[in-house]
Amino acid sequence: METRTPRDPNTLSNYHNYVTRHTSLDFEIEFERKRLVGSVVLRMESLTDAEVDVVLDSSFLDVSAIKVDRQSAEFSIGERIEPYGSPLTIKLPAAVPKGKTVEIELTVATTEKCTALQWMEPAQTSNKKHPYMFSQCQANHARSVFPCQDTPDVKSTFSFALRSPLPVLASGLPTGASKYQPAKKDGASGTLKYTFEQPVAITSYLMAVASGDLACASIGPRSTVWSGPEELLECQQELEGEIEPFMKAIESIVKPTYQWTQYNVLILPPSFPYGGMENPVWTYATPSIISGDKQNIDVIAHELSHSWSGNLVSAASWEHFWLNEGWTTYLERRIQGVLHGESHRHFSAIIGWKALEESIERYGADHDFTKLVIDLKGKDPDDAFSSIPYEKGFHALYQFELLLGKDKWDNFIPHYFETFKFKSIDSYDFKACLIDFFAKDTEANKKLAEFDWDKLFYAPGYPPKPDFDQTMVKSCYKLADKWQYLITNNSSSDFKPHHSDVADWVSNQSVVFLEKVQSFAEKFSAEQIHLLGHTYGYDKTQNIEVLSRYLSAGLMAKAPETYQPSAELLGRIGRMKFVRPMYRLLEKADRKLAVETFEKNKDFYHPICRSMVEKDLFGDEKK
């Protein structure tokens, strides 16, 4: 019997025997019962001649019936295996010949334990009129929405039919809204069936759905923005004219051209746990990027880059997550270089290095999760989520740019994406592709032959730190040095802080300045923290990137005037980038307030964020 060796340790499915080629989802979105209910049809191809069982991933699902080629089939749901859910085993009437397909229809409903869906009451939305729901399936949460081969090593095309009383978005191209049904009871709304097609094969974690009181506006020739009606104008003003230059910039670096037809942005409610999620056709984005000054929209450059790295060429397992995020961070910074100049690219990398330092220090420099390629057997991929695959992954690629020279490296980039488009790969595929591409280039071939690949993939801790262009950070560090001298030599310092110190800066320069300040923040008095925030307007800023870092410095300094504003910020944003570090700092400053703040806001957070913060605050005792 021939089998493929499964590369993904975080799936219970037997995807090496059967592989999904097309997924059809037909669900009703029931806001009242907070569930999706309907059916899923999987068209699966046999990779062997002998296997009679199909095993799918499932997690907290209510599966009531299964048909195989329209005939009722026996199935069983195994014991739950944390953190992967329960294997769903379907008995086929007979083994399917290799290369032939079988159609499996499952009648299914989600349950209250679903980890991918967040359901929001009207009170949790901006206009407080209608409920709202959205999904977040990365890393392995699609299995809590529908039984599937929940592994990035499998890609299928998708069809969506989603019935809802409110507008729906899904990770495909919209094909219409029809089949109106009147309300089933007084006071309820009638429903429409919204349909979408995704002709490009995608991984299960890119399955996305959102429904709520949504409106849209154009922001470019290939792009629209969607948000709540009240925020729409503000979102449009922030993003209008910004997307197409990003797209033109990246299309000058990679190949093939943009494959997904439209690039739209959904600005989610503030509880969304990530900066963005690269769902095809619709990037999901945090409202924290809408700062009124167009200073935080680099998140869009990042998610757009995922249209190539992650979505078109996908890491085959979460152990090789750097292939998604390292490439994407690299491409995001290349976009910045094209649009704003190389000094901006280097400036972003300097900010990234600080994030890398924080993650490595938190884990410890010899921790397995600080490696580029990690071992996730028996582990939860969410536990390994940090800036390391982003930033250490970026440095892996930047290392090759420096090693081979930018011109040669730039010839490889489009070749890589053309070679692996529509496929899932691991780090060894990347290595083989790079070596093969330069096989006839004597100089490059010699450098790659001498390169320490084992160190790149498996060494924990820091990558080599390159020399960055310091142009944009010099003034940030200089001002931080003045503050440090003021703090330690108050009487002899002639430095008088003034708003003009930062008047000419872009907001990310304030970010770098505040991150430098954090390195000695515990030496600040409460009065000096007040002076810092008041003088530079950091205590009143609408820019969450800046505000969160100022408040973090205040928490490090144990300055009580920053405690309540920190708690308030934690009650209005669910992005884990801000929430998790701030809870850790607030706990050290005032554990009682940290716990009270979490208990007050835990239902506001997405289940993934809530689970992570619980681990941060309580360890595993809450399980």
Swiss-Prot record:
Function: Aminopeptidase that preferentially cleaves di- and tripeptides. Also has low epoxide hydrolase activity (in vitro). Can hydrolyze the epoxide leukotriene LTA(4) but it forms preferentially 5,6-dihydroxy-7,9,11,14-eicosatetraenoic acid rather than the cytokine leukotriene B(4) as the product compared to the homologous mammalian enzyme (in vitro).
One GO MF term attached to the UniProt entry: epoxide hydrolase activity
Protein family per UniProt: Belongs to the peptidase M1 family.
Entry-linked InterPro entries: Aminopeptidase_N-like_N, Aminopeptidase_N-like_N_sf, ARM-type_fold, LTA4H_cat, M1_LTA-4_hydro/amino_C_sf, M1_LTA4H, Peptidase_M1, Peptidase_M1_C
Cofactor binding annotation: Binds 1 zinc ion per subunit.
Binding residues annotated for Zn(2+), in chain numbering: H302, H306, E325
UniProt cofactor(s): Zn(2+)
Reactions accelerated catalytically: an epoxide + H2O = an ethanediol
Binding site for a peptide: Q136, C137, Q138, P273, Y274, G275, G276, M277, E278
GO biological-process terms attached to the record: cytoplasm to vacuole targeting by the NVT pathway; lipid metabolic process; peptide catabolic process; protein catabolic process; proteolysis
Record-listed E.C. numbers: 3.4.11.-, 3.3.2.10
Enzyme class, broadest EC rank: hydrolase
SMART domains, per the entry: Leuk-A4-hydro_C
Protein name: Leucine aminopeptidase 2
Annotated GO CC locations: cytosol; fungal-type vacuole lumen; multivesicular body; nucleus; NVT complex
